[in-house]
Amino acid sequence: MRRKINSFFAILLCFSVAFCATGCMSHGENNGTGGSQSYTSGIGFSESESDTAKPIDKATDKSTSTNKSTSKSTNKSTDKSTDKSTDKSTEETETPLTLKVASYNIFHAEKAGYDLSKIAKNITDNGIDIVGFQEVDHFTRRNGNVNQMAKLASLAGYPGTGRWFYPAIDHDGGQYGLGIMSRYPILKHDYIKLSSGTAEQRILAHAEIDVNGTIVHFFVTHLSYDGEGGGSSRAKQFNEIATKLSGYDNFILTGDFNTRDLTEYKVISNSAMVNAKGAVTYPDGNSPLDNIVYSTKAWTFGEPTIVTKSYSDHYMIFAQGTYIKK
């Protein structure tokens, strides 16, 4: 009988313990709202960014670490792949450098009635990037003491850092010579005197131009004509020009060569000419006097365009070149 009673009390005791445990847990869920918030915050689901960033336990930390490692690996791999793909795509789609360059003998604007706006319009209408001028006046009386290069640059909307005048001779109270005008800044400029004998002094002008990080060596000249013993003088002048250009792989030469013999320029090594085969630039019907010569190591050029309404005794010639030097 005592055993049965003991067994009964043992069963009753177990039942009471179980009931108490269940009641306590239930009571905590219903009334312990503060404890619930603490739990939620602990696993990183609160709106606080700092709380969210914290791992809750080792297991979670390991998992997070693994995810981070996987993410880094994936990102690194993806970044490399993307970089390679981007680099390759950039190489394939990179736009080559192109320039429209012109040679323009403006006859000191006399044919334009000394109205430089007409000459400037020719340049802007054709989208010229760099132009080499011949027969430019600089503060001469006949031109009303005007700085023609500064005036042309202003009318055409070219920057003040992109134009320069190069004096060949003193004339009419001022100077007369060559000019270079560029949409891009001229970093350096110089010129050399060419052998001219007793005739009018001739020069070769040079500008070092920064075209979006690529240095272009741009030259302009105006050589002797036959009436002043130009044949023998020009041969010397071309040789002197060739010597000067030999120091540059990346050059463009513009000018009025005053000769119909288009082979004379060939003393300039690694070069080619735009304006071959009868492109008339002087209005007597057969005189291709104005030319563009370029380094074949750095450039290719398309066919030239001749602008017949040039307000001068010469037509403006221009062509587009593509930079190929790596």
Label each PLM-derived region with a short phrase:
Residues 25-45, 54, 89-126, 154, ...:
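Active-site regions of metal-assisted phosphoester/phosphodiester hydrolases
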Residues 106-109, 133-144:
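Active-site neighborhood of divalent metal-dependent phosphoester/pyrophosphate hydrolases
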Residues 10-18:
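Hydrophobic helical h-region of N-terminal Sec-dependent signal peptides
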Residues 54-90:
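Long, intrinsically disordered low-complexity tandem-repeat segments
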Residues 1-10:
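Bacterial N-terminal signal peptides that target proteins for export
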Residues 36, 41, 48-50, 63-65, ...:
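Serine residues within intrinsically disordered or low-complexity segments
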Residues 123, 127-136:
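Proline-aspartate-enriched helix->loop->beta-strand connector
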Residues 20-23:
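C-terminal motif of bacterial Sec signal peptides marking the signal peptidase cleavage site
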